[in-house]
């Protein structure tokens, strides 16, 4: 048996809930996993991304902050893929991505991210969003 078959067998043996996501830097492994077990949500981790995402046979992409391009994210979403950004740990970066079209943020600062997300939900008027955008632009 190969790695993917062993993984699927262990995944099923452990009765892991299919709401969990599985990701790897190895696209071929993820595409094979997607083909053999489409019920498992698969993702491709891309440390450095230039241009679009292509048409990988996975459910989502994970890009590093440095490589984030909003247009590429929107295109990926149009083709049915989710996009997550990692590892976002500063207040400034969390502020930026909470208001972005990404499907999720990977962070070590979970409490801070939740607080920022809640604050953005509470203060979400057009003026609030404008001021946040202005603040992020000035901070750069």
What are these language model-derived features?
Residues 1-140:
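Short loop-to-alpha-helix "cap/lid" segments that border enzyme active sites
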């Amino acid at each position: 048996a190969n790695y993917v078959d062993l993984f699927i067998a262990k995944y099923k043996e452990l009765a892991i809930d299919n709401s969990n996501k599985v990701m790897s830097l190895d696209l071929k492994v993820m595409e094979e996993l997607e083909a053999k077990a489409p019920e498992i949500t698969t993702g491709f981790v891309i440390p450095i991304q230039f241009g679009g995402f292509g048409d990988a046979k996975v459910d989502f992409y994970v890009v590093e902050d440095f490589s984030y391009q909003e247009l590429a994210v929107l295109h990926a979403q149009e083709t049915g893929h989710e996009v997550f950004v990692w590892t976002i740990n500063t207040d400034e970066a969390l502020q930026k991505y909470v208001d972005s079209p990404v499907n999720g943020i990977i962070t070590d600062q979970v409490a801070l991210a939740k607080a920022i997300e809640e604050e953005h939900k509470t203060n979400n008027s057009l003026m609030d969003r404008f001021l946040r955008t202005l603040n992020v632009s000035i901070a750069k």
